[in-house]
Amino acid sequence: MGSTDLNSKPHIVLLSSPGLGHLIPVLELGKRIVTLCNFDVTIFMVGSDTSAAEPQVLRSAMTPKLCEIIQLPPPNISCLIDPEATVCTRLFVLMREIRPAFRAAVSALKFRPAAIIVDLFGTESLEVAKELGIAKYVYIASNAWFLALTIYVPILDKEVEGEFVLQKEPMKIPGCRPVRTEEVVDPMLDRTNQQYSEYFRLGIEIPTADGILMNTWEALEPTTFGALRDVKFLGRVAKVPVFPIGPLRRQAGPCGSNCELLDWLDQQPKESVVYVSFGSGGTLSLEQMIELAWGLERSQQRFIWVVRQPTVKTGDAAFFTQGDGADDMSGYFPEGFLTRIQNVGLVVPQWSPQIHIMSHPSVGVFLSHCGWNSVLESITAGVPIIAWPIYAEQRMNATLLTEELGVAVRPKNLPAKEVVKREEIERMIRRIMVDEEGSEIRKRVRELKDSGEKALNEGGSSFNYMSALGNEWEKSWKTQRSERSLW
């Protein structure tokens, strides 16, 4: 519960789907609403019983405690999905089944929310807000190009014959950069798979909200945001206002149990360390792990590598088990690797305090899976990226970073399609850390860092969008109070 007087200020309700990559940006949005708008916020999260890292993130996020967090028990969906169902399908079905519990929980609140905000996988709960007569919004913690593709998919579905990945030409989106076949999001890889029909539905449901919040900022993608608002382009598809209110990212608090990593970084020269992490759910094959180990060693650069057990399945195999697994990884590296890199690199099992590492001046480049949270953490820290997309919309993110923004380098071929060899890994690292090209990339990412800070500061674009939303919610709340609407 927020304030003692239940009618003293507006309340906003947020709904987060499972997974740290979804929970973290929702937590940050909640904190932004509290600190900028001075509202009370309740976050409903669908927890994951298998994620050991989740409690650590929650403890860190709520210091100091700004939002009320209520966990909804995840429903048992085992009888509703195929055992081999994709992560996307599991999330869509799980969030569909959570609707009765979410509706009951919101109805049981002692206050009437001024607005309900759901994340990308929670769009079916927009109907709950509609039934309760509450303003409804979607929060997409990704970039504008991804939103453009998502809401345009129902039209592409009619225009494109056969599989998207077999098209010879890039798919055109009005007013936006075309999407090449190798860039499409995972649900578009197979139109016969359930995750495609779920994604198709998403494209229809997003424009039914009263507005779309995005964890990015206007100056990062001005052309795409222009297209989303112009009725000659995507405005006729989006239909509702789009509010870029980012870049919202975690702030570095107490480092917890991994302070020795920061102690080690303190001893390294400025911008000398390669940080390697594939996000909260990304995994590599054993063959790729070995090649990456050799590439790091051959580059002759200092590094921190967050390692998970290799997988023989998809690259998102650790999505529901973030932070879990065995700590002993020695059997997965080249013989003698851990001995040879003792004075040069650190291998960290499972999880690391990423926001602390990214904020450290010794870090010179981030070898990343290009999940949007990690992208924002890198840009806002002024750190260049080696783009290594694995799943979801990460291929689109990698293209945006390398070809549009010029703040990253990437392998010639997709890591999800074939193993990236040690020689290419070595070259990519040295391009950033040693070659003149790295200085130019570092300059551009620092300019974006400044741009993001400007957007968030008073008078900036993201500040103004968030303030406008707050004013809208407060006006609605005051109207409800004056009408003494019952709850």
UniProtKB/Swiss-Prot annotation:
GO terms for biological process: anthocyanin-containing compound biosynthetic process. Faintly expressed in cotyledons. An anthocyanidin binds at residues 22, 392. Transmembrane segments: none annotated. It comes from the Eukaryota. Its EC number is 2.4.1.115. UDP-alpha-D-glucose binds at residues 354, 369, 372-374, 377, 393-394. The keyword Protein biosynthesis does not apply. Keywords: Glycosyltransferase, Transferase. It is an enzyme of class 2 (transferase). One of its GO terms (molecular function) is anthocyanidin 3-O-glucosyltransferase activity. The active site is at residues 22, 119. It catalyses: an anthocyanidin + UDP-alpha-D-glucose + H(+) = an anthocyanidin 3-O-beta-D-glucoside + UDP. Pathway: Pigment biosynthesis; anthocyanin biosynthesis. In the presence of other necessary color factors, this glycosylation reaction allows the accumulation of anthocyanin pigments. PANTHER family: GLYCOSYLTRANSFERASE-RELATED, UDP-GLYCOSYLTRANSFERASE 72E1. This is Anthocyanidin 3-O-glucosyltransferase 5. The lineage of its organism: Eukaryota, Viridiplantae, Streptophyta, Embryophyta, Tracheophyta. The gene is GT5.
